[in-house]
């Protein structure tokens, strides 16, 4: 769910006007840019509820990794990510969570936006359930269960030239990227384990970046609780 960063400068040295050599118009990467989102998670019945919060993400500047030009961004929850932008597109190469003192290289690059922006472009990355939970077990979140810590999600560019309205404004010429994963869960209606879909939708707009995200995680039994998470851009600098 974290994808937008920072690259190169206006000269050989790092300056205040950093930007990537291969700028992606759907991924503004200049140091100092920030995005604030309203985050709303609607949990399914029984015991439905809605959790609301805000998330701010900021580009922190160039921070080379493994001898290659790399750019760091940080969320106000303390998570950090390192990205590159080159002929392959924009992709993540390392991350650090809020409780860790060190960053970790990704085993494989994690594509955010491919260089080839066509509907024929397909790619995959690993993911975890963001908020799907168990009602009567600890820890409740599926993302902490070994079986669900490395779920393959297949992505594609589903639509282009989209118009998106969020609290930050109305944006045109946007890109819709959709990810689909199958996770094996107990399905109460069939009294069996079954692969069920987990769906991710992201809208990226020119010169702005990510403006909206939706994540669907299924409720398949009374002792599970899924729903829909939505992130909408409320301001950017």
Where are these regions (language model features)?
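Conserved functional acidic sites
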Residues: 18-237
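C-terminal motif of bacterial Sec signal peptides marking the signal peptidase cleavage site
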Residues: 14-16
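Positively charged n-region of N-terminal signal peptides that target proteins for export
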Residues: 1-4
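Sec-dependent N-terminal signal peptides
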Residues: 6-9
């Amino acid at each position: 769910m974290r994808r937008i960063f920072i690259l190169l400068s206006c000269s050989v040295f790092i300056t205040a006007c950093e930007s990537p050599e291969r700028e992606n118009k759907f991924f503004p990467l200049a140091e100092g840019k920030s995005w604030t989102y309203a985050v709303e998670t609607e949990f399914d019945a029984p015991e439905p509820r809605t959790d609301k919060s805000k998330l701010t993400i900021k580009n922190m500047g160039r921070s080379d990794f493994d001898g290659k030009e790399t750019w760091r961004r940080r969320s106000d929850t303390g998570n950090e990510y390192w990205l590159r932008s080159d002929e392959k597109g924009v992709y993540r190469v390392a991350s650090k969570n809020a409780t860790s003192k060190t960053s970790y290289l990704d085993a494989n690059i994690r594509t955010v936006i491919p260089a080839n922006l066509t509907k024929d472009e397909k790619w995959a990355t690993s993911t975890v359930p963001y908020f799907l939970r168990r009602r009567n077990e600890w820890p409740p979140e599926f993302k902490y269960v070994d079986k669900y810590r490395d779920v393959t999600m297949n992505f594609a560019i589903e639509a282009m030239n989209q118009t998106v309205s969020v609290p930050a404004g109305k944006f045109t010429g946007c890109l819709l990227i959709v990810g689909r994963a199958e996770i094996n869960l107990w399905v109460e209606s069939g009294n069996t384990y079954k692969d069920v879909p987990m769906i991710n939708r992201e809208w990226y707009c020119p010169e702005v970046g990510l403006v909206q995200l939706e994540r669907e995680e299924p409720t398949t039994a009374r002792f599970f609780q899924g729903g829909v998470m939505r992130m909408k851009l409320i301001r950017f600098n």
